């Protein structure tokens, strides 16, 4: 089986598992994962960060946004177009409106920033492994947008999305620096290089 076919199969299986979560569980597990993130040095040391607007039962990020704004941090959200992802600053969640793929996005005209200017980038995903490998929706938006990032890239996920076996990775795929779930924080040794992950308590 090709890597593409393996990724497609994994993506389908885990998307179905995530879609089957009742909202009460999404809310409860998201709260735990967000609180873990808020307690990390990744969040504490950041002054400018990028978040995502949750879609299709992804881990929620609203609590992270609230704490970031209260702490005086600058928060940016992705806006998706045919050209790829642009990050635009958001000061209130009601500034996000339905855009591409029905995602809540900032509108054009807001302050923009490139990934190289962030102290932290928080992203979603469909599947991960403990070496920092990630499978997304298959569009490649984050893989293209984050090539120039030098800051930690942290994924929020449910524990069932973190696989014990290595997921199939292709040359263009971006690794994450850490994966935070409702149960644990996995910090990847070697940052974005995909080396063996180490489990850390938050």
Please provide the spans of the model-predicted regions.
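Charged helix-capping and loop-helix junction motifs
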Residues: 66, 136-141
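A short beta-strand-loop-alpha-helix capping motif that often carries His-Thr
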Residues: 84, 121-125, 138
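Surface-exposed, charge/polar-rich loops and edge strands
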Residues: 2-5, 9, 16-20, 71, ...
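N-terminal active-site beta-alpha-beta segment that forms phosphate/nucleotide-binding
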Residues: 2-116
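Glycine-rich, N-terminal phosphate-binding loop of Rossmann-like dinucleotide-binding domains
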Residues: 53, 125, 183
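Short glycine-rich anion-binding loops that position phosphate/pyrophosphate groups of nucleotides
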Residues: 55-57, 126-130
């Amino acid at each position: 089986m090709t890597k593409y076919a393996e990724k497609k199969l994994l993506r389908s299986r885990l998307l179905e598992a995530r879609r089957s979560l009742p909202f009460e569980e999404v809310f409860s597990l998201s709260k735990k994962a967000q609180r873990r993130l808020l307690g990390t040095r990744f969040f504490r040391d950041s002054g400018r960060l990028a978040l995502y607007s949750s879609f299709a039962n992804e881990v929620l990020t609203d609590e992270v946004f609230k704490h970031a704004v209260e702490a005086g941090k600058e928060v940016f959200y992705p806006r998706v177009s045919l050209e790829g992802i642009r990050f635009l600053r958001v000061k209130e969640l009601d500034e996000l409106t339905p855009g591409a793929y029905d995602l809540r996005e900032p509108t054009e005209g807001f302050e923009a920033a490139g990934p190289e200017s962030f102290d932290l980038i928080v992203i979603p995903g469909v599947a991960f492994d403990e070496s920092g490998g990630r499978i997304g929706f298959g569009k490649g938006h984050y893989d293209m947008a984050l090539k120039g990032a030098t800051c930690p890239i942290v994924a929020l996920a449910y524990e069932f999305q973190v696989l014990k076996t290595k997921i199939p990775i292709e040359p263009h795929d971006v690794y994450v620096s850490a994966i935070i779930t409702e149960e644990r924080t996995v910090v990847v040794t070697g940052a974005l290089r995909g080396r063996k992950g180490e489990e850390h308590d938050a």
